[in-house]
Amino acid sequence: MSKIINVIGREIMDSRGNPTVEAEVHLEGGFNGMAAAPSGASTGSREALELRDGDKTRYMGKGVLKAVANINGPIRDALMGKDATNQAELDQIMIDLDGTENKDKLGANAILAVSLSAAKAAASFKGLPLYAHIAELNGTAGQYSMPVPMMNILNGGEHADNNVDIQEFMVQPVGAKTFREALQVGAEIFHNLKKVLQEKGLSTSVGDEGGFAPNLASNADALAMIKVAVEKAGYKLGEDVTLALDCAASEFYKDGQYDLTGEGKVFSANGFSDFLKSLTEQYPIASIEDGLDESDWDGWAYQTQIMGDKIQLVGDDLFVTNTKILKRGIDNNIANSILIKFNQIGSLTETLAAIRMAKDAGYTVVISHRSGETEDSTIADLAVATSAGQIKTGSLCRSDRVAKYNQLLRIEEQLGEKAPYRGRSEIKGKA
């Protein structure tokens, strides 16, 4: 009854108005699953390949009909009759069929959409919520926790059309007792930040991930605005709420230096790490993501040395959810946390392997969306299933972001005390 009888691919739209891939997997007995692949704006060079058509006369080259054809052709043929509950086998069949290091033949977007659809179909067959099925696949059945949200309320960099260099300024409601309470805290800060910006005559337009995107004099100004918003909302910064940054430093790394054009400053690798450290001394910043370029391993070693015992240093472009690269980081004491993005590696099985490797090494784990999202909320289930501890899925507006928060509310309601919200204890470095 769990045999695959059909696999369907189609082109749909993501939250930025670009095409992306959606897949369906159908099983005997009428069970099925459907999932969509997200897409990033600031991407690591070692990510698995997102296959685009390149036809400039259609969606400016961003169509995904080639990836869809791969689903409806070779992938479908290879998976017909296979057992959907054997996720590792399905993913390996697709990986072998592709035969490349970065999935550039079939496309990571095609493979991922089918991988996640198969997991949903298998969960349906087993009569389980998706998080419970993923937990079984991960060997963590019944070991649930609700993630601390990393809420991107102010955008810069590649996620916004403004002069702010750092890509994301986020709040984490670490003092909340439940996920529902944490969501309320974040929403109230978000709405108060809007008022603060309006009072200063600044733009309240939003970026790709729903955060505000005003022009500000400096990155420190962004932190100051958020501090005011937190206080206006009635919360204590550093106690109820901590701050987090995603520098996406690869985006402003040029010729061995870090060029913050918005501030008119240029830093060496160590100089930029010192600059970030100075910000952590002025504000209660508990987490910094991609604080250096993905290839600047010497710089990362210094950054980890000076901040790794106090601050969560998250590798996104650095590790790209890849166990081979993560192992190098672990072996060399680089960073102390990993950002997990399904589409950086291209299958559920490989994603779970990266999460387990990180946790086994004492690294913290942050499950993440991409800037180009859909209504698909699989990452919410993944975060709970693996007890990841943290989730990064945007601001408190745009339904593509809120869909994940709403799914987490439903899961918390279902699990109750079986899925505790641990708050501050989830955000700690390895040391």
Swiss-Prot record:
Cofactor binding note from Swiss-Prot or TrEMBL: Binds a second Mg(2+) ion via substrate during catalysis.
Record carries keyword Translocase: no
Entry keyword set: Cytoplasm, Glycolysis, Lyase, Magnesium, Metal-binding, Secreted
Pathway(s) this gene product operates in, as recorded in its UniProt entry: Carbohydrate degradation; glycolysis; pyruvate from D-glyceraldehyde 3-phosphate: step 4/5
Binding site for (2R)-2-phosphoglycerate: 167, 341, 370-371, 392
A GO molecular-function descriptor: magnesium ion binding
EC category name: lyase
Record: active site: 209, 341
Domain of life of the source: Bacteria
Cellular component terms per the entry's GO annotation: cell surface; extracellular region; phosphopyruvate hydratase complex
PROSITE patterns in alphabetical order: ENOLASE
Location within or outside the cell: Cytoplasm; Secreted; Cell surface
Record InterPro entries: Enolase (IPR000941), Enolase-like_C_sf (IPR036849), Enolase-like_N (IPR029017), Enolase_C (IPR020810), Enolase_CS (IPR020809), Enolase_N (IPR020811)
UniProt xrefs under Pfam families: Enolase_C (PF00113), Enolase_N (PF03952)
Catalytic activity: (2R)-2-phosphoglycerate = phosphoenolpyruvate + H2O
Secretion signal span: none
Cofactor dependency: Mg(2+)
Residues bound to Mg(2+): 246, 289, 316
Documented EC number(s): 4.2.1.11
A single BP term in Gene Ontology: glycolytic process
Stretches that traverse the bilayer: none
Protein role: Catalyzes the reversible conversion of 2-phosphoglycerate (2-PG) into phosphoenolpyruvate (PEP). It is essential for the degradation of carbohydrates via glycolysis.
Family that this chain belongs to: Belongs to the enolase family.
Subunit field text: Component of the RNA degradosome, a multiprotein complex involved in RNA processing and mRNA degradation.
PANTHER family, alphabetized: ENOLASE (PTHR11902:SF1)
Name under which the protein is recorded: Enolase
